[in-house]
């Protein structure tokens, strides 16, 4: 699906999808309508809406959502005249049938997300997105965990399946600007000129905006961000801050900065039951290279078993756990508790 203005940076908001993690997937329909309406009026190119772990992510493992994905999608679609409605789909969680239902509810773009070494599982879903006439994107998560050459190989696979854009996704907020730029530049250089590159950053090391800018300078033309940084861990690149920086750089976005500031402070921040910020727990995510959405699961395990959240996250990083292994968080907490008991007995 061709973009309306291919010469302008494409701004993809993720407040209503990645931000789901911040509220344990409990956005009300009224809340998503109000936020979508504000984003649409501010002329954000696209708005992603679904369970934090993608369509059909509402499960015991990831957390149950307040509403069905199609309800959320339809609510957002009903408010938008300008912005394209986007969904996230993780193969193994969401299916082709789920994607069809999302499209019927109003979604016009899909990002098919896999771990950065598992692009081969995305073929069926990327092909389905193209057949449905959707803007179809490949989304390589946890990009810090693969060498540059491997990342390029996986991006080429997604492109060969029909992806019109491939994202280099720093799901853990673990990359430094130079490292991120290196990955984006390599992927940009390997793919066809017409295949776009996107960047998705997290703020766990306070580098969300800096990494987004580094990725844009390295060749990305799509960028993710969220109002007030609403997202997993310490959040994503704050949309209003990113737009301000890009404006200072002379990069056209077409977004209304003041409207975004108002939406961030008036609509989004009041919904946070846990502040989305860099603190000892979220900083540990970036430092240990752990999937950002593990934060609230790890905090729950910490409270239940009396183990420091940082210890849980550090051990998850050592074990190289990735998205989809949320069930291992409790195992790690119990192992730490057991080791503490053994130490006390000595």
From Swiss-Prot:
Record keywords: Aromatic hydrocarbons catabolism, Lyase, Manganese, Metal-binding
Catalyses which reaction(s): (S)-4-hydroxy-2-oxopentanoate = acetaldehyde + pyruvate
Protein name (Swiss-Prot/TrEMBL): 4-hydroxy-2-oxovalerate aldolase
Record-linked HAMAP family: HOA
Active-site residues, Swiss-Prot/TrEMBL: 21 (proton acceptor)
Transmembrane segments: none
Binding site for substrate: 17-18, 171, 200, 291
Residues the record marks as site: Transition state stabilizer: 17
GO MF annotation: an example: manganese ion binding
NCBIfam families: 4OH_2_O_val_ald, PRK08195.1
Top-level taxon: Bacteria
Binding positions (Mn(2+)): 18, 200, 202
SUPFAM superfamilies linked: Aldolase, post-HMGL domain-like
Domain Pyruvate carboxyltransferase: 9-261
PROSITE patterns (alphabetical): PYR_CT
